[in-house]
Amino acid sequence: VSDRDILPGPATGLVPTVEASPDKLALRRFLRNPAAVAGTIALVIVVVVTLIGPIISPFEPTAIDLTQVRKPPSGEHLLGTDSTGRDVFSRLLAGGQISLLVGFSAALVAVAFGTLAGVVAGWFGGIVDAIISRIIDIMLSVPAVLVIIVLAGVIGPSVPMLIIVIAGLAWPNPARIARGVVLSLREEEFVQAARAIGSRTRFILARHLVPGALPPIVVSATLLVAESVLLESSLSFLGAGVQPPQSSWGNMLNEAQSLTVLSSMPWLWVPPGLMIAVIVLSAMAIGDGIRDAIDPRKN
């Protein structure tokens, strides 16, 4: 499929139309990427099913039934039950809401704050850039899991704590990307022209620089969603994240710490493990697809 459509004309027979916009070209390239399309479909399905979880859940996710302990999948319990007789399918849906809430919220906060910090550093330069750059370097060297475990012990593990701490540890990546883009754009002629005619700094940043930084930041955001979901699941598995009776995919995997469960009760750990894998792989595929679609070398 050509990026330029040819339409019949009255004089020459063929008249080239206006070339497709960069956005349309990027979308076209994204839709030609099978992995990115499959990842998008999978992610949308998981998110939609999780959101309507309270409607389609056959049981309360926290309802205990000691007469149904560790029952295999059946017509009554589609994915079986856990060690206290709770329905695994209902817990999977409820846990998905928590895991996705943490993943998307942490990524959104990190991208918003990181973009702001990076744009400020790149635009003002000098001591402002030096201070923010040193903070970014320090934050990138901090072991995230260790910090969250320590804070969970001091503050107490909770969903808001996870979102804030994960976002606080993740913002340097989008900040570094935004800073690099602004540094490369601030000396461009269109930016200098805007400054020469007296445009306010806020207008220049919002109109010219932030839009230029958005494509790579969107790619970073999709990867941050995957990292945040994976980090929340790891922490909940270790007991430093979401706490029972509230469910998350991570603390559902906590049930699979014995060889007996691993070998003979796969319904307890395969569903949450599969959901984590689907979200992480889908987000990474989408990020790769967006990166390839906006790559200037493909124009």
Language-model segments: what does each one mean?
Residues 24, 34-44, 83-299:
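Alpha-helical transmembrane segments of integral membrane proteins
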Residues 40-47, 147-150:
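Hydrophobic alpha-helical transmembrane segments of multi-pass integral membrane proteins
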Residues 29, 56, 78-81, 261, ...:
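Residue-level signal for helical boundary/lining positions with a hydrophobic bias
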Residues 3-9, 41, 49-84, 234-247:
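Hydrophobic alpha-helical transmembrane segments of membrane transport/permease proteins
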Residues 30, 48, 138:
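Residue-level signature of catalytic and energy-coupling elements of molecular machines
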Residues 1-42, 285-299:
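Transmembrane alpha-helical segments of polytopic membrane transport and secretion proteins
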